[in-house]
Amino acid sequence: MSYPLEEVNKRRTFAIISHPDAGKTTITEKVLLYGNAIQTAGSVKGKGSAAHAKSDWMEMEKQRGISITTSVMQFPYNNCLVNLLDTPGHEDFSEDTYRTLTAVDSCLMVIDSAKGVEERTIKLMEVTRLRDTPIITFMNKLDRDIRDPMELLDEVENVLKIRCAPITWPIGCGKLFKGVYHLAKDETYLYQSGQGSTIQAVRVVKGLNNPELDVAVGDDLAQQLRDELELVQGASNEFEQDAFIKGELTPVFFGTALGNFGVDHFLDGLTQWAPKPQSRQADTRTVESAEEKFSGFVFKIQANMDPKHRDRVAFMRVVSGKYEKGMKLKHVRIGKDVVISDALTFMAGDRAHAEEAYAGDIIGLHNHGTIQIGDTFTQGETLKFTGIPNFAPELFRRIRLKDPLKQKQLLKGLVQLSEEGAVQVFRPLLNNDLIVGAVGVLQFDVVVSRLKTEYNVEAIYENVNVATARWVECADGKKFEEFKRKNEQNLALDGGDNLTYIAPTMVNLNLAQERYPDVVFYKTREH
């Protein structure tokens, strides 16, 4: 059965992870520019700019009132078809960001070379560890003054616990940035700043000891490069494909996305080394990407911000087979067959109505409240894909009604929103409070506005004394009953009626874990 195999093998599905302001938006734009998906890249200077960099065509297409193209972008590069899944930045950081990482086969980690490894990057890397996702690293902003490159590699290795294999090495930085040397190819690529959509032709100098190099970058920088490379080649790791695929080693590239330099280097690495669509574990068996029959899982639901449209879009990662317009699929959780005739597909040429999609691709299903995160769709087989987690929230608020008579609608709304992954809801066992948990502040605002428009419920938040939450289980029924009896004031049920320990402080949580070694406290839970 060969028909989809060449299509499947061509695909590379990845996401970009970074701390806010490391340059992810610019890189996303430049990746599309190099992939010829957009003709102009309007980069953004300064926070006040209203042209907050959304590549031109992303804004164009508001199909049925929902702008979804920003979430998935597909473009051809080096005989591959690359799917880039956007992970929202700081304005709309949420659990969606974490879950998107469960739908990709590799990640590009972008680091601001002036700052090094930052907090959000650490969190996102923890999530990629759940599936040992292969990571490519791009040290960005070489056109500014940066930290010592060796120091940056050490920090990645020590903080993120992943070995670094430098592929390119910088020559100078800031105003003195002259380019990068490619260790494996023994070539120097000289930097000429390209801005916006101008990609400069790169001049290549072959050989580290070529006198042309000294002329091009100056004697001092050429000598500094040779000295540094002697150190680097002695102290750092060589690239190994196996270790990369296992998530143990990351190839490192240096460049400046703003200056259109170095982006093509990591894209070459991505298309050459990153895995094609991978197999996926389900509850009954492993599903291979080369299988003929269609299967896929929902990893994200995008709510519609336009009150005129009550529609939402469920994002599905195709795991195997081929999606064709009008095909009948089994919605496994509810046991119903559905005909999918209007799925949104994200193709390079026509992003609205492409007729087919293969393993590795992402399609959007119109969802009128029946689809939940983690749902599996198949061509008839009853199976459920695993590994689409709920994450313990980090921010909590108590939610209160302005009109106490609408308690029922409030609960219904919150449970539905939690099924959709917009927020998590906890109901303490000992009182009638409703506690809402999120990983990003914006999630709280979204919930209040959607409760109002979709459920006609006006709600407000109050502070609540909760630091963190963990799902709890215990194999020993007797010990679990004792734990529940003695900790009732800290226990709650989540939206799916799973028992949760609500801790007022981290110290409290640590003490509870010490006191009850037989009880397992989970930071993530399967959808």
UniProtKB/Swiss-Prot annotation:
PROSITE patterns: G_TR_1 (PS00301), G_TR_2 (PS51722). One of its GO terms (cellular component) is cytosol. GTP binds at residues 18-25, 86-90, 140-143. Its main location: cytoplasm. GO terms for biological process: regulation of translational termination. GO terms for molecular function: GTP binding; GTPase activity; guanosine tetraphosphate binding; translation release factor activity, codon nonspecific; translation release factor activity, codon specific. Residues 9-278 form the tr-type G domain. Belongs to the TRAFAC class translation factor GTPase superfamily. Classic translation factor GTPase family. PrfC subfamily. Increases the formation of ribosomal termination complexes and stimulates activities of RF-1 and RF-2. It binds guanine nucleotides and has strong preference for UGA stop codons. It may interact directly with the ribosome. The stimulation of RF-1 and RF-2 is significantly reduced by GTP and GDP, but not by GMP. This is Peptide chain release factor 3.
